[in-house]
Amino acid sequence: DPILGPEMKSTGEVMGVGDTFGEAYDKAQLGANSAIPSSGRVFISLRDCDKADGVIVAKSFTALGFELVATRGTAAVISQAGLKVDVVNKVAEGRPHIVDMIKNDGVTLVLNTTEGKQAIKDSASIRRSAENHSVYYTTTLSGGEAICLALEARKKQGQQVRRLQDLHLRVQR
């Protein structure tokens, strides 16, 4: 289950180096064998306290060419901001729901923030399905922002490989 506890939010085993945070994050994800998809459809479901800031992330995804799909409450906030968004049922609301979309390759990326034990439990099937179908998944708004920065950097400069020796020379100057 890829949900992050407090002790896991700041650990990692790969390093990405770039001129910007976005470039470095993109490379780190690639190094962790978790390449960020550059197109498709993003599923967004946000806890209430994240919805206002989530609109900013949704706008970034739209600017990058992604389509949006969201649960009813999140979709209402995104739609009020003037963005096109399709609505999908939560698992408990009946079919077709988000797990069906994931299984049918209907989304390429999931941004799902939760709060409380019940919401975390309810989202377990989404996390499990995303993992089983290799759908990129993040559980925080900051993760969504990082994804957008990574994709913006990739769009601007591509993915450049740099030798560590050259980086060390730059630092020594």
PLM feature spans:
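ATP-dependent carboxylate/acyl-activation modules
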Residues: 1-104, 109-139, 144-149, 156-173
